[in-house]
Amino acid sequence: MPHLPLASFRPPLWGLRPSWGLSRPQALCTQPEPHGSPVSRRNREAKQKRLREKQAALEAGLAEKSKIPAVPTKAWSHKEVVLYEIPTGPGEKKDVSGPLPPAYSPQYVEAAWYQWWVREGFFKPEYQARLPQATGETFSMCIPPPNVTGSLHIGHALTVAIQDALVRWHRMRGDRVLWIPGSDHAGIATQAMVEKQLWKEQRVRRHELSREDFLRAVWQWKHEKGGEIYEQLCALGASLDWDRECFTMDAGSSAAVTEAFVRLYNSGLLYRNRQLVNWSCTLRSAISDIEVESRPLPGRTVLQLPGCPTPVSFGLLASVAFPVDGEPDTEIVVGTTRPETLPGDVAVAVHPDDPRYTHLHGRQLRHPLTGQLLPLITDTTVQPHVGTGAVKVTPAHSPIDAEIGTRHGLTPLSVIAEDGTMTSLCGDWLQGLHRFVAREKIMCTLREQGLFRGLQEHPMVLPICSRSGDVVEYLLKSQWFVRCQEMGDLAAKAVESGALELWPSFHQKSWQHWFAHIGDWCVSRQLWWGHQIPAYRVIGENAEDDRKECWVVGRSEAEARAVAAKRTGRPEAELTLERDPDVLDTWFSSALFPFSALGWPRETPDLAHFYPLTLLETGSDLLMFWVGRMVMLGTQLTGQLPFSKVLLHSMVRDRQGRKMSKSLGNVLDPRDIISGQELQVLQAKLRDGNLDPGELAVAAAAQKKDFPYGIPECGTDALRFALCSHGILGGDLHLSVSEVLNYRHFCNKLWNALRFVLRALGDNFVPQPAEEVTPSSPMDAWILSRLAFAASECERGFLSRELSLVTHTLYHFWLHNLCDVYLEAVKPVLSSVPRPPGPPQVLFSCADVGLRLLAPLMPFLAEELWQRLPPRPGGPLAPSICVAPYPSTRSLEFWRQPELERCFSRVQEVVQALRALRATYQLTKARPQVLLQCSDPGEQGLVQPFLEPLGILSHCGAVGFLSPGAAAPSGWALTPLGDTMKIYMELQGLVDPQSQLPRLTARRQKLQKQLDDLLNRTMSEGLAERQQRISSLHLELSKLDQAASYLQQLMDEAPSAREL
């Protein structure tokens, strides 16, 4: 080994022997190290590949290293499942006296903790008020009540992950937190499910039972099946106050619904009228806008619909002639996608300025089916450049036509009945036929009469009932409506004035537009399951006309009777009242949830302390249907906004960018990700669903492609962390299982890190308070500074509700700062004799603070590991990590050393460069010496304190300095680092040029071929990615040429060395 000319070796920082003499302890990971014991060729090649990948990362810049990978860095292999088998009663604290299992296992980690948290009352605001770190501030929030019928899908899991992270952070920082759990009775969905069950088990239809018997069956089903969703919430770690759980059909909620209806009616904001409503013929009920799925059709599309005997074609435009009365050779051709509504036509409309029809203004047309006279009317809403410029007017079955009919005084004709068949107004030849069967019969008749003018493909949007799959009809029905204009104006002004904050702010535009065009809200539903409308019809009062019926509203029949007596002037005893059999829209009770869940209309302590809510967090798809209605009714009924801040997260989509939907078969069940699931079971779930054969085949193929070996067990913590790691406040969220799996690997990394820390601390370790922990080396100071910085960034992320900043910060600290750097650097220090006292205290601080930072996002893993840390003198900070103080910026600011971090960033660049050199020359075992030549004395001063850890982290031997201007040592490889530093690494005696040169040549030929292929491609093929890859190949080729030059130099010098 040649002498190092003008080299100055830095003595070891911790009083140890030089790093080239150290025996390296076993690494934390389970794979053998490249410089350890002999390894197989396969393992060695795998290690070299990883080193090359790290070299590429260096070339892309160190900033890339801090990014959280979007895909796993390790292939999945089945892991051994470890179970927690120590007998522990429900609610008892988990036994953590034994050693940690060798590897992370989600089932072991997640066992027993949740029941203990609940029993101890950690989730109750009364407990939090007694915490030492109590701030006296209140944080209240409610969960968007999921439908009691179903199970949580991945969209629900996203909501829970976000809300629970925020709730746990507020609780740990000392706020008095109330997170209200609840579930929605889901009128249509629940009734449909129970009807299916009754038919399947008893062959009984709903109408064969009395209303009381059917509701009894629904409640029985709810008690038996409805708890599944609560079990899922617990499995996700949702820290809800279960003592305050509410159901939208329980006694308290029912009283609130009745009170709200009565107050709105008495205020003139609720009325009954005959208007067009969204109607599901299969359900025989009005449905809400959110239950109408707008399905775009590019052209002719064949659908099989419930209740229809044959498939139906949509996306076709039929042209029909309307003869002009008195002019046998003159006709107006009208295009329609709904020929079945022709019997309901009462006019044809054209634009008043359309020159094609000016001469026909005021004329009469003959109905093509009945021959009746119809007026030709003019209306400015008609678009003259669309089709023929003439439209048929069917006020009873089209919202647009209803407006035209109202303006022109046209009488609507209802030709489609509640069950989707044709009414008696159509004549005997159509009455009772399914509307889509009648469609074909009508077109055949038009052909026979010579009035059919053709059929062509036509793109359209088809309204589909999301509950039944049937086409939505617009029917005229007598229903109850809420006047929304006045309340909507107040909701719009609340956002405009800043009293109500929507985040992200770009939702404000949609909010203002929706409320500027809001119509009245139909709240009647023709169901049995739900809140029966507290309205009563007075029998005998104008009963011959439903538009003039006498209706009264009351909290009870007695109250309604008193109102009826006053209105009619008749004695109460003489009145006969009949209660409206309809129920209220589920969204009506949901809109009351923020205050009904707290006891409204009663003046309860919870209502006084926690209302208005601090924050409303939900999916952006519910902004209008739920959030908007909560704001309207909350302001109207309580005199206050129900919340002042709304946080709207993105929609979850699959890897192809499609919305996750049961109708597409691409929904991810959180339980499958948490516990793992075999492909056969996943495919069976698809077959058991309601997909048609074509959709089933597509969904099954996609599922098999995405999960050829099923879904691996990832655990709750990994799923929560993955969901929160996305920028949830912007565009759609594209989640893949591979991302979640990557975070399971991250959990395993944390697990192994804490096993190392616990071994390093030993049995007699006594932690010092954070303010007394003094770094004994630059590395100690650096990791503590990074820890304080992580705490500051996490606090900033939680305050701004940007959870992706929190996850990014924690991932980077634990993986890249603590595990990859500090633990590797400190291992030789911990094995030294005598062992300095500083590093163990630093390790404890990193584990304690790091786990508390992590706890809101990974509550199970954080609790499991934190409970095993050595106890502090005088007892632990808290009985559970979920009520321990959350580290704040102020509490750790004494550790911050930004200048030191900047210095070490340069050291890390040197480490990366050295690792890249080792990979190039395949120095898997040897520890070459290193010389650094700095042209700037200041830079040498930055690096000098870290020479010892630099050698350890780069797996090199002694590290020293070469004086500026000194000649390069012979037999050493050179790589520049910017313009101010040259790095020399010893090659003489460590590399065999004769074996390495052919390898480099082969590698160069392979890369050159890749480069030639890229250069020969057309410029249009992924230009940006192509240019980036070309630049990377040029750089790698240049480095290979340089390496080959050094190896050739070694070969040339070999003979003279032998002669000596």
UniProtKB/Swiss-Prot annotation:
Q: Which cysteines are joined by disulfide bonds?
A: none
Q: Which InterPro entries match?
A: aa-tRNA-synth_I_CS, aa-tRNA-synth_Ia, Anticodon_Ia_Val, M/V/L/I-tRNA-synth_anticd-bd, Rossmann-like_a/b/a_fold, tRNAsynth_Ia_anticodon-bd, Val/Leu/Ile-tRNA-synth_edit, Valyl-tRNA_ligase
Where is the motif ('KMSKS' region)? 659-663
Q: Where is this region: Disordered?
A: 25-50
The record lists the catalysed reaction(s) as:
tRNA(Val) + L-valine + ATP = L-valyl-tRNA(Val) + AMP + diphosphate
4Fe-4S among keywords: no
The kind of enzyme this is, by top-level EC class, is ligase
Chief place where the protein resides? mitochondrion
Q: Which UniProt keywords apply?
A: Acetylation, Aminoacyl-tRNA synthetase, ATP-binding, Ligase, Mitochondrion, Nucleotide-binding, Protein biosynthesis, Transit peptide
Localization (cell) = Mitochondrion
Instruction: Kindly provide the name given to this protein in its UniProt entry.
Output: Valine--tRNA ligase, mitochondrial
- In the UniProt record, the gene name given for this protein reads Vars2
